[in-house]
From Swiss-Prot:
InterPro entries: Leucine_aapep/pepB, Macro_dom-like, Peptidase_M17_C, Peptidase_M17_leu_NH2_pept, Peptidase_M17_N. Its cofactor is Mn(2+). It is an enzyme of class 3 (hydrolase). Its main location: cytoplasm. This is Probable cytosol aminopeptidase. Mn(2+) 1 binds at residues 284, 361, 363.
Length: 515
């Protein structure tokens, strides 16, 4: 058993023809679609040319008929096809035929196929040849994300016996296929890094350890790193981080990770600067306002925002984005104890705003407020901030759709990009009248309202108070989407999902390209 998590992503290669040798143990993943005949539903192979001969396609389709396959979405079948040099064929259903395929449909299909591979270590696929934008990258992302596993804390008795997916060969004739495939692999590997961090239990991942891992990851790609310990935080006036963390014997940290990408730009003076902020509550009991015991173990995921930000900024460095990206990551453990903050306490946030703590379980916004003010001191053009902020997010949008709040135009831009990459963020309003619900009789603000309703929006309004007026800002609330408590689906496993890593990185790419 190892206690150092780290999913080892498979290698990725691109080929323009079906390999003829050395693939006897590999599985060929082939997409199939429904025939559309209601009285006699069936499945036919999609995206076969130029990789499969007509007689091979006929052989696969005959096998599908024998299994009564319909080509429905997520339907998989394993076939022996003697005319091929591979060990077996795995077909994955896409549903009804389309002229062009949405990238996330292919990403999900690849993920479904990867989860059905069992002990197979090498795959070849024709999925990437389907028509549509971003299909090659999506294929690789789906295969890697779908094959993700986390077994660092399992003994030999329960650990997987196989090595997992180790090699992916993408069949694709596009000129930029290799570039697109490697891009998809890099993105998926970053998501896996975020998943690893979130899945690590709080016994092994506390503020100092999370800071250490963030530092190690960041230095490996050349980022500048600053780790601020509890003494320095207190001296500098980070009242939110200190207040939340003071109940734990494991003190808080704040980490700054800096990618100086403007020097890679054609015109460095015009390169944009983006601030990232992610909530790093390594475990959240709720503090004195303690949570119910039944689902408290899921609060190992309360640093999902921090994990995504760490993964995103390291990916920006790895892929050499020509913009400056500065991540500010506050880290604390929210515990009840004789030294914990109490409901009714008043703390002074970094920057001087005073906050009455009416509920110690609304702690994320307190550490985020400190980090936001610090991030805005760098005078960024944009601020993207993410956290498992509110249970109200799941009430409003469910467990798969992040809520996106912030400056209207930038909020909509982030939400649109999130939908394009398949993380499906949805824009939410921040009505000005909700600020009245945050009035305090003893401080500048209260950390919660006295109302039952609009909890996500109230939290967003609270955070907005700490954002500089000159900064375009978006907050992504991933309270539900960051951690899947149900069954695996598509390329999403049970447990940590890595959301919203892909959204944030795609926004960075968009800013690098379009300003």
């Amino acid at each position: 058993m190892t206690t150092e998590p780290g999913y080892l992503s498979p290698s990725v290669a691109v080929a323009t023809s079906m390999p003829k040798r050395g693939v006897g143990a590999a599985v060929l993943i082939v997409p199939v679609v429904s025939t559309g005949e209601e009285d006699r539903p069936g499945a036919v192979v999609a995206s076969a040319e130029p990789f499969l001969r007509a007689d091979t396609v006929a052989e696969i389709e005959a096998g599908l008929r024998a299994l009564d396959a319909t080509g429905a979405s997520d339907q998989v079948h394993r076939l022996a096809v003697p005319s091929l040099p591979v060990g077996s064929v795995l077909t994955v259903g896409l549903g009804k035929p389309r002229r062009e395929w949405p990238a996330d449909t292919i990403r999900c299909a690849a993920g479904v196929a990867a989860r059905a591979l069992n002990s197979s270590e090498a795959v070849i696929t024709t999925l990437a040849e389907l028509p549509g934008d971003g299909i090659c990258s999506a294929t690789v992302e789906g295969l890697i994300l779908g094959s993700y596993r986390f077994s660092a804390f399992r003994s030999d008795k329960t650990a997987p016996k196989d090595a997992g997916l180790r090699k992916i060969t993408v069949l694709c004739c596009a000129k930029d296929a290799k570039k697109r495939a490697l891009h998809g692999a890099a993105v998926a590997t970053a998501v896996a890094t975020a998943r690893d961090l979130v899945n690590t239990p709080p016994s092994h991942l506390f503020p100092a350890e999370l800071a250490k891992r963030a530092k190690t990851l960041s230095e490996s790609v050349g980022l500048d790193v600053e780790v601020i310990d509890e003494k320095a935080l207190k001296k500098a006036g980070y009242g939110g981080v200190i207040g939340v963390g003071q109940g734990s014997s494991r003190p808080p940290r704040l980490v700054r990770l800096i990618h100086r990408g403007s020097r890679l730009a054609k015109n460095p003076q015009k390169a944009k600067k983006v601030a990232l902020v992610g909530k790093g509550i390594t475990f959240d009991t709720g503090g004195i306002s303690i949570k119910p015991a039944a689902s408290m173990h899921h609060m190992t995921s309360d640093m999902g925002g921090a994990a995504a930000v760490i993964a995103t900024v390291t990916l920006a460095a790895r892929l050499r984005l020509p913009i400056d990206v500065i991540a500010t990551v506050p880290m604390a453990e929210n515990m009840p104890s004789a030294t914990a903050q109490r409901p009714g306490d008043v703390l002074t946030q970094y920057g001087g705003t005073t906050v009455e703590v009416l509920n110690t379980d609304a702690e994320g916004r307190l550490i985020l407020a400190d980090a936001i003010v610090r991030a805005c001191e760098d005078k960024p053009d944009y601020l993207i901030e993410t956290s498992t902020l509110t249970g109200a997010q799941t009430v409003a949008l469910g467990t798969r759709i992040p809520g996106v709040m912030g400056s209207d135009e930038f909020r909509d831009r982030v939400a649109a990009i999130s939908q394009r990459v398949g993380e499906n963020g949805w824009p939410m309003p921040l009505p000005d009248d909700l600020k009245d619900d945050l009035k305090s009789t003893v401080a500048d603000l209260a950390n919660v309202s006295g109302q039952r309703f609009a909890g996500m929006l109230v939290a967003g309004v609270f955070l907005r108070e700490f954002v500089a007026e000159s900064v375009d800002w978006a907050h992504i609330d991933v309270a539900g989407p960051a951690y899947n408590t149900g069954s695996a689906w598509g390329y999403t496993p049970k447990g940590a999902t890595g959301v919203p890593t892909r959204t944030m990185f795609a926004v960075l790419e968009d800013i690098a390209k379009n300003g």
